[in-house]
Amino acid sequence: MHGQVATIKDIVLEERPEVVDLHCNEQLLDSSESEEEDSVREQLVEQAQQAYRVVTTCGICKCPVRLVVQCGDADLKVLHELLLGDLSIVCPGCA
């Protein structure tokens, strides 16, 4: 543009529009692959859980009570807090 007002002859279109591929190149997972991913996640959860031996005393007769729990670290801490609080385990003889 050479002036204060644009005219049609001043507008020059040099670029041509290009064809753009609008197809997505993603591939969907088939059901077997998603099942494999689910089983891997389940295995990771199972690995996070471990078996822990817990030794406490009976809430009634005070004899030792042993049990095994399978849980994660966070759940074990919750069980620990419960056993330190009002929760009591009762032996089979007192049950």
From Swiss-Prot:
Q: Where is this motif: LXCXE motif?
A: 22-26
> Which UniProt key words apply to this protein?
Activator, DNA-binding, Early protein, G1/S host cell cycle checkpoint dysregulation by virus, Host cytoplasm, Host nucleus, Host-virus interaction, Inhibition of host innate immune response by virus, Inhibition of host interferon signaling pathway by virus, Interferon antiviral system evasion, Metal-binding, Modulation of host cell cycle by virus, Oncogene, Transcription, Transcription regulation, Viral immunoevasion, Zinc, Zinc-finger
**Which residues form the unnamed zinc fingers?**
58-94
- Report the leader peptide range: none
Q: Provide the Gene Ontology terms for cellular component.
A: host cell cytoplasm; host cell nucleus
Tell me the function of this protein. Plays a role in viral genome replication by driving entry of quiescent cells into the cell cycle. Stimulation of progression from G1 to S phase allows the virus to efficiently use the cellular DNA replicating machinery to achieve viral genome replication. E7 protein has both transforming and trans-activating activities. Induces the disassembly of the E2F1 transcription factor from RB1, with subsequent transcriptional activation of E2F1-regulated S-phase genes. Interferes with host histone deacetylation mediated by HDAC1 and HDAC2, leading to transcription activation.
Answer whether the UniProt record assigns the keyword tRNA-binding to this protein.
no
Q: What is known of its domains?
A: The E7 terminal domain is an intrinsically disordered domain, whose flexibility and conformational transitions confer target adaptability to the oncoprotein. It allows adaptation to a variety of protein targets and exposes the PEST degradation sequence that regulates its turnover in the cell.
A Pfam family recorded for this sequence? E7
Descriptive protein name:
Protein E7
Q: Where on this chain is Nuclear export signal (motif)?
A: 76-84
A molecular function annotated in GO for this UniProt entry is:
zinc ion binding
The record lists the organism as: Human papillomavirus type 61
Concerning its family, UniProt says: Belongs to the papillomaviridae E7 protein family.
Where does this one sit in the cell?
Host cytoplasm; Host nucleus
Q: How is it modified after translation?
A: Highly phosphorylated.
Q: Where is this region: E7 terminal domain?
A: 1-42
Q: What high-level taxonomic lineage is stated for the organism?
A: Viruses, Monodnaviria, Shotokuvirae, Cossaviricota, Papovaviricetes
Q: Which GO terms describe its biological process?
A: DNA-templated transcription; symbiont-mediated perturbation of host cell cycle G1/S transition checkpoint; symbiont-mediated suppression of host innate immune response; symbiont-mediated suppression of host type I interferon-mediated signaling pathway
Q: Does the keyword DNA repair apply?
A: no
Q: Which HAMAP family match?
A: PPV_E7
| Subunit comment | Homodimer. Homooligomer. Interacts with host RB1; this interaction induces dissociation of RB1-E2F1 complex thereby disrupting RB1 activity. Interacts with host EP300; this interaction represses EP300 transcriptional activity. Interacts with protein E2; this interaction inhibits E7 oncogenic activity. Interacts with host TMEM173/STING; this interaction impairs the ability of TMEM173/STING to sense cytosolic DNA and promote the production of type I interferon (IFN-alpha and IFN-beta).
